[in-house]
């Protein structure tokens, strides 16, 4: 679960990490009040969205006077960034920046440890930095039996090229990041940029914290926030009790069982396609459940074609086939659909699909290759 920047900064301040003075605004009138209260001349207006890339999308603006702040606030409140409307703006004092650094603590799934990532090139996406300048990133693994230790700050200090008198500040920040990570069951604590200000302070100009959804039972204060970062399709799927996650591809995926669904996605990637989602209908899915699953996937604007991969154990293939046909009849969406079907009542399921002009395969690889051809407009 992602937290907004202002929420991440509230947590950071609670643990002693310095952030710029700021006030949250939900209207232009609030921006007016915030500007007057900050009484600082130049301010930064930062749209509060849970998607990335807001800076490139124009979601962060500077203003040097009240009139300019109100004009730019109106612009921000009228924006949508990657489909998410801007409903909150963090109005912050502008900070004189000497250098922009990067600092995060995250989970290294390969080593099954927490790892600090530090770089002297802050303000850019860490994925882009890792791709273009991997030598500019310092990795400091954390022994789970020891936790944070002061040598980590000394190591980072030298790599970042900071003066020795900044060790205390950096140590406090890294120690606090570790405490936040543990106390909140976080998957990521990131300050990008972590600014080295003109007067020699280390200040978190941005804060990104992601909480492990599975830990929310331990955090009742965070439970009301769960699901707010879901897309409209994910919200519908949640209401219907589907395991559904949106991805960036264009091939819709529906299968039964998490293992088979992931294997289907892996196969699509292996042959050069890009899955648009993960949707597991579960075992013993009824015609009605299949119908609703297909409707979610086939109506998504990014999906160009749909692959349904079913192994019929307690799931009956004829029920699946009937659900597919009903969904296509109700939605009237003309997108290619390919089905791989094997197992209980397979023959009846194949008959139903073939009668309605839907291609059916027995082998998964054949079905995957066919759906990729259809997406590419081949055959």
Swiss-Prot record:
Catalytically driven reaction(s): succinate + ATP + CoA = succinyl-CoA + ADP + phosphate; GTP + succinate + CoA = succinyl-CoA + GDP + phosphate
Residues involved in substrate binding: 256, 313-315
Enzyme Commission number(s) from the entry: 6.2.1.5
GO CC annotations on file: succinate-CoA ligase complex
Gene Ontology molecular function terms on file: ATP binding; magnesium ion binding; succinate-CoA ligase (ADP-forming) activity; succinate-CoA ligase (GDP-forming) activity
Protein's GO biological process: succinyl-CoA metabolic process; tricarboxylic acid cycle
Subunit structure comment from the entry: Heterotetramer of two alpha and two beta subunits.
Name of this chain's protein: Succinate--CoA ligase [ADP-forming] subunit beta
Source organism: Desulfurococcus amylolyticus (strain DSM 18924 / JCM 16383 / VKM B-2413 / 1221n) (Desulfurococcus kamchatkensis)
């Amino acid at each position: 679960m992602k937290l907004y920047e202002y929420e991440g900064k509230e947590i950071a301040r609670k643990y002693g990490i310095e952030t710029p003075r700021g006030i949250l605004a939900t209207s232009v009138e609030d921006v007016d009040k915030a500007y007057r209260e900050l009484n600082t001349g130049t301010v930064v207006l930062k749209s509060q969205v849970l998607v990335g890339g807001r800076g490139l999308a124009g979601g962060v603006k500077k203003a040097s006077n009240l009139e300019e702040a109100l004009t730019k606030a109106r612009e921000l409140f009228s924006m949508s960034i990657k489909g998410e409307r801007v409903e909150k703006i963090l109005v912050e004092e502008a900070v004189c920046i000497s250098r922009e650094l990067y600092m995060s603590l995250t989970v290294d799934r390969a080593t099954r440890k927490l790892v600090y990532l530090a770089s002297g090139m802050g303000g850019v996406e860490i994925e882009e930095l890792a791709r273009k300048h991997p030598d500019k990133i310092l990795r400091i693994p954390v022994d789970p039996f020891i936790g944070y230790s002061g040598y980590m700050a000394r190591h980072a200090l030298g790599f970042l090229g900071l003066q020795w008198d900044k060790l205390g500040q950096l140590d406090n920040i890294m120690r606090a990041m570790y405490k936040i990570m543990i106390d909140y069951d976080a998957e990521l604590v990131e300050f990008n940029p972590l600014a080295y200000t003109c007067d020699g302070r280390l200040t978190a100009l941005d804060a990104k914290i992601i909480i492990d959804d599975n830990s929310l039972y331990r955090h009742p204060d965070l439970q009301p926030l769960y699901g707010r970062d879901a897309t409209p399709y994910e919200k519908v799927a949640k209401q219907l009790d589907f395991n559904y996650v949106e991805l960036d591809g264009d091939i819709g995926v529906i299968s039964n069982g998490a293992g088979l669904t992931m294997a289907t996605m892996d196969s699509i990637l292996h042959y050069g396609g890009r899955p648009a989602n993960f949707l597991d209908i579960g075992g013993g899915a009824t015609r009605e459940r299949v119908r609703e699953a297909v409707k979610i996937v086939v109506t998504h604007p990014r999906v160009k074609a749909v692959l349904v991969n079913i192994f019929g154990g307690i799931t009956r293939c004829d029920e699946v086939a009937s659900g597919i046909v009903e969904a296509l009849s109700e939605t009237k969406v003309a997108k290619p659909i390919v089905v791989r079907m094997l197992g209980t009542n397979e023959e009846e399921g194949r008959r139903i699909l073939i009668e309605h002009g839907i291609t059916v395969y027995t082998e998964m690889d054949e079905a995957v290759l066919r759906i990729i051809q259809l997406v590419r407009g081949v055959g």
